[in-house]
């Protein structure tokens, strides 16, 4: 397994709920402020230093590449943020349409409301202060970095498994892979929702749960209750559920 669980329950975080790139139509354009990511942990806990939410490419053009930081939200530093009294923190954009519980911490405008389209992997990680060399990016000069960076390629040999130099140094607490319908796709998390698997090559861990959503592009995903595992699909003890979002 590529998932490395945190050293203590109090430090463990989970991606509890996520909605990426709501669909649009000619009469109902996509609203950037409708995207959301909810994180779950211990009630009132302060998130440890070196904790990040990251996006990792899952398409065949740049598999394993870390998405850019900044307003796009590809790399979000969660260090020092405090979870609400119900143990949750939600990432939203100003003008969002949601009513949020007063017991939930709200983190606004750390993305531009334009999370990557469904062909990405989302992870909660802690770097433990450990540096990992990047691929040098456009300069070709590798740099050792203790924080995730867009020059980091988590899968340099493109085999669908996060390279050991990252899993040995960093803790991957939780993750989800969301795939569309490219001919070759890369899924690095232990739960994968794919629009279709028919005629596709999906490079992944052999232990991962793969859900084929029957040619429907799921955009909303959530953990069931206080689940901590990676079962999904039509099973009685599922940990994850997903669904489509109407465009109007």
Outline where the language-model segments fall.
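Sec-dependent, cleavable N-terminal signal peptides
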Residues: 1-12
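Activation on beta-sandwich/Ig-like modules and their edge loops
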Residues: 10-198
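Broad, structure-driven detector of short, well-ordered beta-strand segments within folded domains
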Residues: 221-223
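A recurrent domain-boundary module in secreted/ectodomain proteins
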Residues: 225-248
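Extended, solvent-exposed regions of the mature portions of secreted/cell-surface glycoproteins
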Residues: 185-219, 228-229, 242
């Amino acid at each position: 397994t590529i998932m490395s669980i945190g050293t203590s329950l109090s430090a463990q975080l989970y991606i509890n709920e996520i909605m990426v790139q709501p669909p649009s139509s000619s009469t109902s354009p996509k609203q950037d402020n409708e995207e959301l990511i909810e994180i779950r942990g211990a009630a009132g806990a302060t998130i440890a230093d070196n904790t990040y939410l990251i996006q990792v490419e899952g398409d065949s053009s740049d598999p394993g590449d870390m998405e850019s930081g900044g307003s796009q939200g590809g790399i979000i530093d969660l260090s020092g943020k405090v979870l609400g009294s119900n143990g949750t923190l939600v990432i939203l954009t100003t003008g969002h349409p949601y009513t949020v519980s007063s017991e939930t911490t709200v983190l606004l405008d750390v993305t531009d409301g334009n999370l990557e389209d469904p062909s990405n992997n989302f992870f909660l990680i802690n770097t433990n202060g450990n540096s990992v060399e990047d691929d040098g990016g456009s300069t070709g000069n590798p740099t050792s970095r203790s924080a995730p960076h867009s020059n980091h390629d988590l899968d340099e040999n493109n085999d669908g498994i996060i390279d050991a130099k990252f899993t040995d140094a960093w803790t991957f607490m939780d993750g989800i892979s969301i795939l569309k319908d490219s001919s070759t796709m890369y899924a690095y998390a232990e739960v994968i929702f794919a629009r279709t698997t028919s005629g596709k090559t999906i490079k992944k861990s052999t232990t991962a749960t793969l859900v084929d959503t029957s040619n429907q592009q799921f955009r909303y995903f959530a953990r069931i209750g206080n689940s901590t595992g990676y079962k999904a699909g039509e099973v009685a003890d599922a940990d994850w559920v997903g669904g489509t979002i109407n465009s109007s």
